[in-house]
């Protein structure tokens, strides 16, 4: 979680579990632990002094007990949220008299001292609810509501449900919908790690874990361990229900470490952090159930989850008609030394707009995160596209040995005096 220049990390802790699995004892309870960082790279574990563990409060534990199983916090950006509830969280727990897990809510003024908001499930009961892994929630300013993605089971397959609510403590049953993967192959996907992408918050990006239950690695440590191996994939959505999985390949592979080829590894943490002007950090677990269990940081270029890519022989695409707000167009791209990107603006019927034809656009080459483009036929307009603002257009993009990661129409920054 990014909070005014401070990065906060929450993780489930365990201490020298002799069983080597998820069985917790009185001497080895489930805990929620806390770390923080100013750069997302170097992390400290502050002494919180909140929870007694083995006779001492000198630790970074902020919660102990069943709720630590799937404790998932977020910074509440709802402008109406009181200061005492600046942070919120969900967690799976067992409520007396219930056979299945319930999803309960928590609030906190500082992200460290947490209060449970009752022993009721904030999600209506349903026999398909599971909740036993990370359930992601957040305030969505584009909807003006809270959104949650939580684990469920559909015909024996791990699945995820969507719900939305104006009240974090109560989620209406009529808002609940199953994820729709739009015809993608049926796979065991859960812990979706999905949140709005910070640079385009109207788009959700997710990194669900993909579980292969019938594959067992030789490194699988003992008969008490769960079978299966895991990796992570990428998906995106504009409404939180319909998810685009056109990229079916693994986003995060287990790699060469044999201890990453056991179950419950390669889970991506919810929340991408921008840790530099041109990079995003993504965090994931490795060596689960092993004494060397740890979190690892991976780095992507800004907007670098996927790209439109063309080889040396080249390729092109044309968008659907759209309108834009702003007066400049910026590209995030890279090419080879021999590669290039060229653009053309067309009217909604596919006809080139005078002055914005492909032949008037100088080929772009290089590696840029934020490159404002111009057409040579329009020197008097410079980079301005103001005359086309609000008009339906198409964008034609021609690539050769190049990758286009993102494009953005925006208002040009005022000239410095």
Q: What is each residue range found by the language model?
A:
Residues 1-417:
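Carbohydrate-active catalytic/glycan-binding domains of CAZyme proteins
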């Amino acid at each position: 979680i990014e909070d005014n220049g401070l990065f906060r990390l929450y993780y489930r802790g365990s201490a020298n579990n002799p069983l080597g699995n998820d069985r917790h004892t009185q001497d080895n309870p489930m805990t929620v632990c806390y770390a923080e960082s100013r750069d997302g790279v170097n992390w400290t574990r502050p002494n919180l002094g909140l929870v007694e563990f083995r006779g001492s409060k000198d630790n970074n534990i902020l919660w102990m007990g069943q709720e630590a199983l799937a404790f998932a916090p977020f910074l509440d950006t709802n402008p109406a949220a009181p200061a005492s509830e600046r942070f919120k969280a969900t967690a799976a727990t067992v409520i007396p008299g219930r056979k299945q897990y319930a999803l309960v809510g928590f609030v906190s003024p500082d992200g460290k001292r947490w209060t449970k908001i009752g022993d009721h499930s904030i999600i209506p009961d349903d026999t398909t609810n599971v909740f036993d892994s990370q359930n992601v929630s957040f305030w969505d300013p584009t909807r003006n509501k809270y959104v949650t993605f939580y684990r469920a089971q559909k015909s024996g397959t791990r699945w995820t449900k969507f719900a939305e609510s104006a009240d974090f403590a109560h989620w209406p049953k009529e808002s609940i919908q199953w994820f729709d993967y739009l015809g993608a192959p049926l796979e065991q996907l859960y812990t979706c790690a999905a949140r709005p992408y910070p640079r385009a918050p109207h788009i959700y990006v997710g990194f669900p874990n993909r579980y292969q239950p019938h594959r067992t690695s030789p490194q699988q440590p003992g008969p008490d361990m769960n079978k299966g191996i895991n990796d992570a994939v990428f998906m995106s959505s504009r409404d939180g229900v319909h998810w685009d999985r056109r990229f079916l390949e693994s986003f995060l592979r287990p790699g060469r470490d044999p201890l990453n080829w056991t179950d419950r590894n390669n889970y991506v943490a919810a929340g991408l952090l921008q840790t530099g002007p041109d990079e995003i950090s993504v965090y994931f677990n490795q060596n689960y159930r092993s004494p060397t269990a740890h979190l690892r940081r991976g780095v992507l270029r800004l907007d670098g989850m996927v790209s439109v890519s063309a080889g040396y022989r080249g390729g092109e695409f044309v968008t659907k008609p759209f309108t834009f707000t702003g007066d400049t167009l910026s590209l995030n791209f890279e090419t080879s030394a021999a590669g290039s990107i060229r653009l053309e603006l067309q009217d909604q019927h596919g006809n080139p707009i005078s002055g914005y034809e492909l032949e008037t656009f100088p080929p772009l080459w290089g590696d840029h995160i934020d490159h404002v483009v111009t057409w040579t036929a329009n020197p008097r307009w410079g980079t301005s596209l103001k005359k086309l603002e609000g008009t339906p257009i198409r964008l034609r993009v021609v690539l050769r040995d190049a990758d286009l990661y993102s494009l953005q129409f925006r208002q040009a920054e005022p000239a410095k005096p």
